[in-house]
């Protein structure tokens, strides 16, 4: 068993409210259309299915623990995009010289901002946005150069840390390029981090300068700057806040424009600056937090360049005609890598946010255009939660259609699903049935990149069908500079993450405790190890954790132990099947330590034993509870509920009452909202070593518990 839902998407069920004669006629037209389109397809087009079925990766030798490499890198792993461009400043200089006057970074002008009163009395900010205003490659290069020089004038030294705590926007990328040019080590922080995590990261990295926005300065930084004693300069990317004088003595607030002006003046005096080496740290990327405070991952210039080299190889015909929409956090390795790939290939990057992405987004005033409608991107990265939200919204619209429209949509959906499985295109369905759905993302998307968490087969196939494009599902970690695997554009299989990128190799290590071995049949299984130049330098000021997760082999190659369990399919594609640690990443990106949740709740008088469960396909935690018989019986009496022990444990009312007790205890134990179980299953039977659900030491056997409660897991999460 594994932690995944089915890897096979299901068809939509037809509601037979349509006239049978009309239905028969529609089926006849579909059959006729299929025959007519198949003939030219057969003679003039190579089947996508043939490409999908080809071998994509191979083991480098015949040993069970052999590393797998892409068939395009069997003779050696790729490490650079362009010859001689071995640092990020050289990559940008190359791109600037090649695409000098081409548009690079775009931002929409805010035309108007209004308060809109909702039916419940709440007030939402709504905006009307104008066209995209663009900076060319030359513009960005000059601004980055001047900003870096200005930071140097403020006392920033090469190989010292500088933090960026800012939303995704053009200024973020300009600041990053400045740091790459001047060899400043960029400490990246999520804009959603809480106060203690921000303080920890800033103090651990000993930064004196931080780049931020007015809003984050006012809402988050202002309250904690007194806890960061080394901080001297705060640079706001969008103007100085009106209350800047409130800050502690010794801290100066600058605008980005002022720092650029300072740098431009100094550059006229030809101030020299230090250039980075490939082995120098480019980024210290703080994770969003897992077991407590976030860790900083040290990523060198060569790590990032190797990673984006692998990513770029999986995007065919990438070039000047492409437009990428940037809205995910740039502090996440997926977004940073995707934007650096685009920047290095002449693509335009238009900035957005989850609140302004589409016409229906929460901050867009009704009747005005969202960012995708205005930008019409060809490339987009998304996390599964966003794709799931799109899926649910579209299906809600489908359910509101007339009976005829709904059945026509379902017929077209199922027909296209069948054709996709055979590697064929459906131009009529795309033009007449799915055009309106496709327009939700601008109408021009040719590739969706998905990462951050596993994507369900149903949602992946929905995106394929309704948005008429492949989904490049990938697997990578911050610790591997985002590199690992990405599925190829013509591979329409679901439930897997593709073959290793050309910059890295992957092997499977036996995990005896979990019962996974690289000698397993029919497919080798084990803990996923990633090797190659993209594997990062380790954790900042955390040597013990670095030694636990990284190692070098006899050839000097660096490897990362991911803690994820995978299996290689016959064509060399990787499938994630389990997780070694009890640390689980929820669909929205939060990390939950199942052991931490259990520790907070297992000492309750009402609880004899508890197992928390979560997976990356869903956004909440559930639990299995062995209740204390005396306490549960007393609780039932107080609530007026009667029945046998089994009846009480199987009672929905009793589950809800126990859940209330657990929730109160979780809040008292200071668990985060996303860590608190939302649904539970009460077990009338105790867990003993004889049942096989716990060890002789009464430690939970998670794999066996998951198998035992599989039906309850499906009930509590619901099937798609």
Swiss-Prot record:
Catalysed reactions, as listed in the record: a long-chain fatty acid + ATP + CoA = a long-chain fatty acyl-CoA + AMP + diphosphate; (5Z,8Z,11Z,14Z)-eicosatetraenoate + ATP + CoA = (5Z,8Z,11Z,14Z)-eicosatetraenoyl-CoA + AMP + diphosphate; (E)-hexadec-2-enoate + ATP + CoA = (2E)-hexadecenoyl-CoA + AMP + diphosphate; 15-hydroxy-(5Z,8Z,11Z,13E)-eicosatetraenoate + ATP + CoA = 15-hydroxy-(5Z,8Z,11Z,13E)-eicosatetraenoyl-CoA + AMP + diphosphate
Keyword field: ATP-binding, Endoplasmic reticulum, Fatty acid metabolism, Ligase, Lipid metabolism, Magnesium, Membrane, Microsome, Mitochondrion, Mitochondrion outer membrane, Nucleotide-binding, Peroxisome, Phosphoprotein, Signal-anchor, Transmembrane, Transmembrane helix
One Pfam short name: AMP-binding
One GO BP: long-chain fatty acid metabolic process
Cofactor(s) needed: Mg(2+)
Cytoplasmic side: 42-720
Zinc recorded as keyword: no
Modification Phosphoserine, positions: 683
Gene3D superfamilies cross-referenced by the UniProt entry: N-terminal domain of ligase-like
EC number: 6.2.1.15, 6.2.1.3, 6.2.1.2
Record InterPro entries: AMP-binding_CS, AMP-dep_synth/lig_dom, ANL_N_sf
GO cellular component: endoplasmic reticulum; endoplasmic reticulum membrane; Golgi apparatus; lipid droplet; membrane; mitochondrial outer membrane; perinuclear region of cytoplasm; peroxisomal membrane
Recorded superkingdom: Eukaryota
Protein topology in the membrane: Single-pass type III membrane protein
Main location group: mitochondrion
Record field: transmembrane: 21-41
Family stated for the protein in its record: Belongs to the ATP-dependent AMP-binding enzyme family.
Protein name: Fatty acid CoA ligase Acsl3
